[in-house]
Amino acid sequence: MQTLRDVAVGETVKIVKLHGQGAVKRRMMDVGLTKGASVHVQKVAPLGDPIEITVRNYALSIRKADADMIEVVPE
């Protein structure tokens, strides 16, 4: 299982599953991180947190902990 946290800068992946429950999962879905969405990793901060991604044509920064909950496959 590859998570969004494992994706290298410049790669594009597709979301296959969101882990997590309740408000955390709902928040991720509200910002466009849904099953089947294409995600491009733009950059990662020096200490690895946060991760800047592009999803549905807008930029988004997420924490490492949130990126660990997003299961992805290469596009």
Model-derived features with residue positions:
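Short alpha-helix capping/helix-loop boundary micro-motifs
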Residues: 24-27
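C-terminal structural segments of small proteins and small subunits
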Residues: 45-75
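Absolute protein N-terminus
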Residues: 1-2
